[in-house]
């Protein structure tokens, strides 16, 4: 299977190089990708000592349209790592991919964005404030090495498939298991989106169970209002038999003006975790967003009851 992935990737790359060498009416064009997530936060009560400025994450890259439906993109992810102290930053290559759009098909190869929760993250819309549910609670990875394909049947139905290493973009492939995923998206009318996704991650050997993921989502987005909900389930987490998680997330926003909107979100994860966030977003010009927000988190996964209350001023800069 790995050989097939690399062969398909090589064919796609060669095709792209050949297409870019040919004369075309499509003029190549590119754009820089820069996104910076930062915040100031302070705790209340027993978290009163937790305060400070934080550079949460930075994305730097470039996207180039070659013409004939081909596009290449490379993105670096600069953020914190669990393997080093908080005062350190570490850089990863998050995307190094080639995309080909032809007819109703979209094909991706390389270090690509995954499809497990991409729709939910875009609908949530405040990634610089908080990760989407599956990303936050480690139900899956946002990018991985492999290939994906999507086909649009008509205006209201599309489907996609993906095959990747299954270990994310921060780890190299050290094991033999792969991850497979199938998804379908329905848009019965403008503004309403429904999606279902199923994924399976193989165990490295007979001692490890296959991980299974089910992700469902429904969301309504209007010009001034949006409301979405998702339910997610994971069987055999960490390749451990019987270690199952599930949970849901509900979120919405309302526009007060072209520059200001308010948002709410509630998460409930079966791993004894709940979270609530409420905030206001202010668009300061074209490239900057500011969002004062309040967060409540509850976590008694270790048998100890504990609530935390935090105030944030989240900041986004990007183009």
Segments predicted by a language model, with ranges:
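Transmembrane beta-strands of outer-membrane beta-barrel pores
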Residues: 38-44, 57-59, 76-82, 102, ...
């Amino acid at each position: 299977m790995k050989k097939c992935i690399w062969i398909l990737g090589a064919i796609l790359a060669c095709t792209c190089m050949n297409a870019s060498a040919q004369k075309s009416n499509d003029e190549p064009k590119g754009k820089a990708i820069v996104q910076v997530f930062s915040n100031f936060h302070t705790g209340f009560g027993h978290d009163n000592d937790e305060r400070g400025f934080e550079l949460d994450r930075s994305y730097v890259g470039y996207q180039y349209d070659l013409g004939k439906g081909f596009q290449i993109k490379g993105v670096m992810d600069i953020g914190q790592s669990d393997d080093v102290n908080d005062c350190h930053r570490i850089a990863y290559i998050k995307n190094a991919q080639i995309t080909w759009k032809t007819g109703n098909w979209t094909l991706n190869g390389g270090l690509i964005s995954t499809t497990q929760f991409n729709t939910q993250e875009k609908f949530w819309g405040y990634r610089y404030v908080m990760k989407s549910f599956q990303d936050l609670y480690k139900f899956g990875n946002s990018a991985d090495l492999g290939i994906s394909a999507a086909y649009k049947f008509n205006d209201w139905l599309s489907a996609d498939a993906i095959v990747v290493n299954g270990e994310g973009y921060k780890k190299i492939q050290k094991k033999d298991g792969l991850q497979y995923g199938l998804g379908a998206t329905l848009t019965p009318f403008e503004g309403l989106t429904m999606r279902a996704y199923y994924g399976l991650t193989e165990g490295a050997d007979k001692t490890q169970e296959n991980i299974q993921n089910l992700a469902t989502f429904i969301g309504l987005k209007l010009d001034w209002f949006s409301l979405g909900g998702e339910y997610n389930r994971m069987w055999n987490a960490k390749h451990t038999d019987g270690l199952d998680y599930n949970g849901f997330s509900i979120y919405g926003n309302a526009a007060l003006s072209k520059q200001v909107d308010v948002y709410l979100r509630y998460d409930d994860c079966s791993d004894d975790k709940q979270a609530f966030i409420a905030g206001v977003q202010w668009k300061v010009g074209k490239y900057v967003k500011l969002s004062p927000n309040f967060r409540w988190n509850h976590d008694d996964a270790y048998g100890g009851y504990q609530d935390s209350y935090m105030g944030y001023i989240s900041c986004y800069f990007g183009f």
